[in-house]
Amino acid sequence: MITLTQRLDHAHPVTASVTLPIDIRVKSRAKVELNDGREAGLMLPRGLLLRGGDLLSTDDGNEIIEVIAAPESVSVVRCADPYLLARACYHLGNRHVPLQIMPGELRYHHDHVLDDMLRQFDLDVTFAHLPFEPEAGAYTSDAHSHSHAHSH
């Protein structure tokens, strides 16, 4: 089995690829199947969030694997009004929903309850199978390092 131990920070010739959903791309240890059918193990530093296009390598550098973000069931909100989009971000963030934020568009794992909530704000919510690349704060190891205590 191939053991992938590091993420590379510059381009290298790719020897294979692996398509992974976000639930695996946030793990530092996992057994995965490369797109060519070979098995590989992730043995990466903790707190690393893999993105589509990232390159992983074995210790000896003989294998360079490109990460592909798998299409997932997502809800998609498209809106030209920055105020409405900000309201949607606020309410989803208040519920600690992992969220992908792009100009005029939001994506989150499909959830009909959240879809209905956003429709109450007159937002258009659709369902799609697309790569999901949420903001890193929802997944990195320091995501919840802030204090919830308040002093007055």
UniProtKB/Swiss-Prot annotation:
Descriptive protein name: Urease accessory protein UreE
Disulfide-bonded cysteines: none
Entry's transmembrane regions: none
SUPFAM superfamilies: Urease metallochaperone UreE, C-terminal domain, Urease metallochaperone UreE, N-terminal domain
Chaperone is among the record's keywords: yes
Subcellular location: Cytoplasm
Keyword Transport: no
